[in-house]
Amino acid sequence: MAKKKSTGPQPSLSSSPNGRAKVTAETITTTTTTTTDTTNSYSLLNIWVISLALKILLFIGYHSTDFDVHRNWLAITNKLPISQWYIENTSQWTLDYPPFFAYFEYLLSLLVPRFVANDGCLDIVEIGQYGLPTIYFQRLTVIISELVLFYALQTIVKTSPTLSAKRRMYVATASLALSPGLILIDHIHFQYNGMMYGILLLCINSARLQQYLSCGFWFSVLLCFKHIYLYLAPAVFIFLLRGYCLKFYWNKRKNFFINIFNFIQWINLFKLGSIVILVFIIAFGPFYNVLPQLISRLFPFSRGLTHAYWAPNIWAVYSFLDRILIQIYKKIPMSKYPLLKIFQFDPNSLNNDQLLKTSTRGIVGDIEFFILPNITPKLTFLLTLFYQIMALIPLFIQPTYRRFVGALTLCGYASFLFGWHVHEKAILLVIFPMTLLVARDQKLLTPFNLLVSCGYGSLFPLIFTCNEWLIKVVYTYTWYIIFYFNFRKVVRPSKNNIIGNGIGNGNGKGGGIILDRMVNLYILLFNVVVIITSLFDLFKHKYPVLQNFEFLNLMIYSVYCAIGIISSWNGFCWLYFIDDGIWNQDQ
């Protein structure tokens, strides 16, 4: 029989005394070099350097009042004893983040150079007066704090088990490292979300590695930095409880009560509980004497249902529908009787034009609707809780990493879509965990594309200055185009095709081809929304009549993006509850 011709470098073998082949050092060196090269090719360092250049260029750009918020917190934590941090109210920008973030601000205040302090950076005043030194310093702290995010992203790639998994995770983590949401919110608007989402990703990666104690630790730390992540807490709680603290095993030789007692792994529960409690003691212990004031700062319940700019959720559509019904009632006489009969509202309230202009714009205080029933905090809480519980049931039955990230995503969806006084920036709670899943199956691409296009697009009104318009639009569109194609290169093909599954397949094949095209058309039409609203902003100062419709462009953004995000939620829910193949634990 003829020997097969070698087509590449073969391992070098030498004979050992016992007659067995032995791999030489040359082979080991070659293998090690190949592995090292593969690992280095998935480094995020070059992406960090590229993004760093852009972020530095944004130093002198627009910043929101959040900049002065954090400047005031630097001053409070630097100049006052810890007992007064949550009491001081010289400025309206009072400290209203959990203690770990206050400690973080204190550490930053210790790094303030003298010339920056002399610029007004550490002055406790009602209205801050500062110049470029303060701006440069605070901008730089955001970049430095974001190293936590890049460390977490690189850790996710590094700990991926196979080369194909590394490749998929590299695309996913690169998309998060270059996220338009972080550019707009952190590096223009001004916040520290990058660091916080880095901690969240460390928690998620610990769950993937089945490091349950580490997962609980990181999430506890995260809650002590920013309490908005309480929205994700149910998924983390169920995952740790079911995966680490409960063991369903029935011993027929033992009685009922002993078996029930043995369901709980008490040692694991004690270890996990000790870590969580210790983190919260370290965070809140020094504020024991001012806990009531601290809690009232963290959870102010006097705010309205919607924010000044309606977050693109269910309540944006609800508010829009109320405005439409008001116009129908006023313009179409035949509609008055059926509307009064169905909704039982006071028609005299529609005569107050001043109230009509302000009632549903999300101004702090109680929000009233004129025709539709008013929404209470209790109702929003119950709706959020209901949809979160629905997501937690499959996680409790199947406490795997994939189910965990899916449940995190749905908990983020539920809180964003149904929560009380939701900020548009909270859409990142949904985007970040879902990004880690999207390359898992091509069917996830359709809801993901809807989510990121409408989610990131809904952030555009945050940056309303002309100088930054080109940056926010061009950067976001460039990001979307790059990762639209890159995700398609690495996404895993669907193992099964559910015809009529309520969403597309992500590749325009099978039963979802029509819905895929509808989604793509919807995303393309968002360009029209951007153009119309931009022209409105451009000409409203030239034509005074347009100033009567000041809220119109914000409403267009909110409602259009809300429809897309709600649709992406519906598609993701279908896959989460129906398509079990996506959630299997194979690599």
Curated annotation (Swiss-Prot):
Biased amino acid composition, Polar residues: 7-18
Membrane topology, Cytoplasmic segments: 63-139, 193-220, 296-298, 400-415, 465-466, 540-557
Pfam families reported in the protein's UniProt record: Alg6_Alg8
Topology in membrane: Multi-pass membrane protein
Presence of the UniProt keyword Membrane in the record: yes
The keyword Glycosyltransferase is annotated on this UniProt entry: yes
Membrane-spanning segments: 42-62, 140-160, 170-192, 221-241, 275-295, 299-321, 379-399, 416-436, 444-464, 467-487, 519-539, 558-578
Lumenal topology ranges: 1-41, 161-169, 242-274, 322-378, 437-443, 488-518, 579-587
Reaction catalysis annotation: an alpha-D-Glc-(1->3)-alpha-D-Man-(1->2)-alpha-D-Man-(1->2)-alpha-D-Man-(1->3)-[alpha-D-Man-(1->2)-alpha-D-Man-(1->3)-[alpha-D-Man-(1->2)-alpha-D-Man-(1->6)]-alpha-D-Man-(1->6)]-beta-D-Man-(1->4)-beta-D-GlcNAc-(1->4)-alpha-D-GlcNAc-diphospho-di-trans,poly-cis-dolichol + a di-trans,poly-cis-dolichyl beta-D-glucosyl phosphate = an alpha-D-Glc-(1->3)-alpha-D-Glc-(1->3)-alpha-D-Man-(1->2)-alpha-D-Man-(1->2)-alpha-D-Man-(1->3)-[alpha-D-Man-(1->2)-alpha-D-Man-(1->3)-[alpha-D-Man-(1->2)-alpha-D-Man-(1->6)]-alpha-D-Man-(1->6)]-beta-D-Man-(1->4)-beta-D-GlcNAc-(1->4)-alpha-D-GlcNAc-diphospho-di-trans,poly-cis-dolichol + a di-trans,poly-cis-dolichyl phosphate + H(+)
GO molecular-function term, one example from the UniProt record: dolichyl pyrophosphate Glc1Man9GlcNAc2 alpha-1,3-glucosyltransferase activity
Pathway: Protein modification; protein glycosylation
Family annotation (InterPro entries): Glyco_trans_ALG6/ALG8
EC number: 2.4.1.265
Region feature Disordered, mapped onto this chain: 1-30
Primary location class: endoplasmic reticulum
GO cellular component term of the entry, any: endoplasmic reticulum membrane
GO BP, sorted A to Z: dolichol-linked oligosaccharide biosynthetic process; protein N-linked glycosylation
Keyword vocabulary terms for this entry: Endoplasmic reticulum, Glycosyltransferase, Membrane, Transferase, Transmembrane, Transmembrane helix
Localization annotation: Endoplasmic reticulum membrane
Function: Dolichyl pyrophosphate Glc1Man9GlcNAc2 alpha-1,3-glucosyltransferase that operates in the biosynthetic pathway of dolichol-linked oligosaccharides, the glycan precursors employed in protein asparagine (N)-glycosylation. The assembly of dolichol-linked oligosaccharides begins on the cytosolic side of the endoplasmic reticulum membrane and finishes in its lumen. The sequential addition of sugars to dolichol pyrophosphate produces dolichol-linked oligosaccharides containing fourteen sugars, including two GlcNAcs, nine mannoses and three glucoses.
UniProt family annotation: Belongs to the ALG6/ALG8 glucosyltransferase family.
Protein name per Swiss-Prot or TrEMBL: Dolichyl pyrophosphate Glc1Man9GlcNAc2 alpha-1,3-glucosyltransferase
